[in-house]
Amino acid sequence: MSSTHAEIVTITLAQQILKTFDLGGPEMPAYQLVVNARPCAMCFGSIPWSGVRSVVVGASGPQVEKITGFDEGPIHPQWQQELRKRGIEVVEDVLHDEALKVFHRFHDTGQPIYNGRTGD
């Protein structure tokens, strides 16, 4: 399924387990989403709706696209500021090199790269 990205699945499971659509609601702890790379367009859109209060990112989107050939979709150039102005903290470059190694290993497997525009 093209929508089963880690961020979407994680947010969905957390909301199901906690029985709330708002992970930032009253009396909720400050939930944090930790990802190995900048969220793609779809995952980025889900973050403000989720209620998480911070996002921790390993590698940048352009780096991942270069390594893997993924098309991460149109991302606002100031995506970090867009989240921050909605009260969501953004921390970048956490374990940056380690995050890139994961994508290099994926690329080296020769597995197909899903790209909805080409039907691959």
Regions found by a protein language model. Give the residues of each.
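Zinc-dependent deaminase
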Residues: P29, S46-D120
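Immediate flanking context of iron-sulfur cluster ligation sites
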Residues: G24-R38
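Acidic helix/loop or adjacent segment enriched in Glu/Asp that either coordinates divalent metal
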Residues: M1-I17
